[in-house]
Structure formats: C-alpha cells, structure tokens
C-alpha cells in the first residue's frame, strides 16, 4: 500500500503543474498530459516516487541522519517549520543565506550570537540595560531567529536535505551538491530534476500539496527513529492505483 493514495494526491492538487510555456523539458518523463495550457503531472509516477522518497528518508533516519527541511516561499514556510519540528529536525523557511552550509563556521558565529542574546534575557541582563539597548538587542535577535532560528540547534551539516521547490531554492541545491548532501525534493514542471537525488514530481505551489508531501517526509523520519507505530497517519487511505490513465484524465478535466 502506498504511503499516499491517488485520491489524496488528487484532492491536494498535486497533479497541477505550471503553464506549458514555463516547463523544463527535463520534466517530460513525469508529465501525463496538457490541459488548457497547463501541464498535468503523472500521479501514478508521483505515487511510486513518494514511496521511494519515504523509504529513503526513513532508512536515513534509522541511521541517525540529520535532516534539513528547506522551503522559503509563502506556500511552504509554515508546513516546512511545523513538520521539521514535529520530526525533531531542522528548517530554513525564510530567505536562504548564501553560504549557509558552505560557510558553516561563519553561520555558527551568528548562531552563537543568537544564543548569547537569549542567555542575556534568561539571566536578567535585559533588566539592567538601558531600554534603547534592549530594543536593539531584540531587533537583532528577531532577525537572527528569522533566518537561522531553525538551524540554531542543528549539531552538524545535514546528512539529507528535503527541499520544496528546488527551482526557487537553487542556491540551497548548489550548496548541497558542493558538499555531497543528498537532496529529496518536490519538483514541479518548471524545475530541473537533474541535480535532485530523489525526485517527487508534484505541484509545489499549492499549500495543501506541500503540506501533504512534507508531512509524509516527517512521518518517514519519525518511523525511522521510533518505529512504525510512531508515525502519524502512516497508513494511507485505500490506494486508488487501479484507476486507469483514462479515468485520471477524466478527473483532471472535471468530467
């Protein structure tokens, strides 16, 4: 049984790609058809590739992998943070800072600064400082928290990265490739799948689609760490794989 059923994929709109004029030809193997100027992703392939991604992440998690979730656009930011935290992992959900991984030591100095400011407040230092200085410290902390708060406790460079929309996160993908970090990603029809190690062809612009796939990656981590019973909603609804391509086309066309 698939970890996500065909019905769930359809209901979340995972099959809707971009306008045909915006496509990346390298995504052709994952495209089922074209309707009204929009590419339709082949959900039979997505269903199988989600399973592959789930197993890949689960197996990595069993080995104690550190997983970094990345998704900085508004449709992804909330799900990326929520699911990373649920899985006990780390995230970047605002702008990716160039060198976030390739200049890891420099980023760590900013992490140290964030922790210093938090410690100052915890120890009561804020109470004896001038109000103007406290305001400045809070502004600095807010900015640091926004950009690096999700990796402040990450013990090392990640072993695996999960990325929503590698087309938008090209800098993150490039840094992962430079460091040899495998990338699992939701890849829409406008993106280049070649740099991605584990491709999940999917609509990366719909909040429901992003939430569905991202939650399954979190489930995979939880299952890998704690066993099958710990993963929420691990068993998908009865798979609708028997639906023929013709039936899928009818659903897409709204017949």
From Swiss-Prot:
CDD domains named in the record: RPS2
Keyword field: Ribonucleoprotein, Ribosomal protein
Intrachain disulfide bonds: none
Pfam families: Ribosomal_S2
SUPFAM superfamilies per UniProt: Ribosomal protein S2
Any one of the GO BP annotations: translation
InterPro entries cross-referenced by the UniProt entry: Ribosomal_uS2, Ribosomal_uS2_bac/mit/plastid, Ribosomal_uS2_CS, Ribosomal_uS2_flav_dom_sf
One GO CC term on file: cytosolic small ribosomal subunit
GO function terms (MF aspect): structural constituent of ribosome
Region Disordered, residue ranges: 233-255
Ribosomal protein listed as a keyword: yes
Domain of life from the UniProt record: Bacteria
Keyword Isomerase belongs to the record: no
Family: Belongs to the universal ribosomal protein uS2 family.
Name of the protein: Small ribosomal subunit protein uS2
């Amino acid at each position: 049984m698939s970890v996500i059923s065909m019905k769930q994929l359809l209901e979340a709109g995972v099959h809707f790609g971009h306008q045909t004029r915006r496509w990346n030809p390298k995504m052709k193997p994952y495209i089922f058809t074209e309707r009204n100027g929009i590419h339709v992703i082949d959900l039979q392939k997505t269903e199988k590739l989600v399973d592959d991604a789930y197993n890949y992440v689960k197996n990595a998690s069993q080995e104690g992998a550190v997983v970094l979730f990345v998704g900085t656009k508004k449709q992804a930011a909330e799900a990326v943070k929520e699911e990373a935290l649920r899985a006990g992992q780390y995230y970047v959900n605002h702008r990716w800072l160039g060198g976030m991984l390739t200049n890891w030591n420099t980023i760590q100095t900013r992490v140290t600064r964030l922790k210093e400011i938090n410690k100052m407040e915890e120890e009561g230092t804020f109470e004896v400082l001038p109000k103007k200085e406290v305001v400045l410290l809070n502004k600095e902390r807010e900015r640091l928290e926004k950009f690096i708060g999700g990796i402040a406790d990450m013990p090392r460079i990640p072993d695996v990265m999960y990325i929503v929309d590698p087309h938008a996160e090209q800098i993150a993908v490039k840094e992962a490739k430079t460091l040899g970090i495998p990338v699992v990603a939701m890849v829409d029809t406008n993106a280049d799948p070649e740099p991605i190690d584990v491709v999940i062809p999917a609509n990366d612009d719909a909040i429901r689609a992003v939430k569905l796939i991202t939650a399954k990656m979190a489930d995979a981590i939880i299952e890998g760490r704690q066993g099958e019973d710990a993963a929420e909603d691990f068993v998908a609804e009865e798979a609708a794989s028997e639906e023929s391509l013709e039936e899928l086309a009818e659903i897409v066309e709204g017949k």
